[in-house]
Amino acid sequence: RHPPCSFYSGSKALGEEAIQGLGRSYVWRLRIPFDQHDGPRNYLSKIQRYSKVYQNANSLSHRGDFVRACLDLWASRAPFGTYNVTNPGFVTTGQVVERIEAILKPGRPFVFWANDEEFYRTAAKTPRSNCVLDTRKLREAGVVLRPVEEAIEESLKQWQAEPPKPS
């Protein structure tokens, strides 16, 4: 919640801080959402639309898996607290691009930023967090999600592109 961070990161941290002492509450952390539905908030869509992509490693959350996991936590009366609800494992941007190229065959090359310095000087307004979240607590509560690589693969195989916008 301390600069330099994005408004989103700061407000998220402040929100978690505010409810931390309440006791009977859940914080279900989503990280970089995606699924098979093309759209402006979908990580897989964003990667395809960027003119240049930034190489990093992150945990990701398949939106459908996230919802099912949260409902399972609630239904099973899992202990209150904070849960990292991400598909197990992590992927790099390069791995995601490889799957997009292999499955969707976009017909264009993906260009990566040369290095962090170029990316931050040219494109980023705030620092990017590259994070791999620990899902052990989720697993220990009895909620098992499919590995992130499998969720990405299935989403791309079932990809539903947005219709072109009328001119």
Where in the sequence are the language-model features?
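Active-site "gating" loop of Rossmann-like NAD(P)-dependent oxidoreductase/epimerase domains
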Residues: 1-6
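Active-site helix of classical SDR
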Residues: 11
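C-terminal amphipathic/interface module of NAD(P)-dependent oxidoreductases
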Residues: 126-167
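NAD(P)-dependent short-chain dehydrogenase/reductase
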Residues: 17-65, 72
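Amphipathic alpha-helical segment in the mid-to-C-terminal domain
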Residues: 63, 93, 144-148
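Mid/C-terminal beta-alpha module of Rossmann-like enzyme folds, strongest
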Residues: 76-125, 154, 163-166
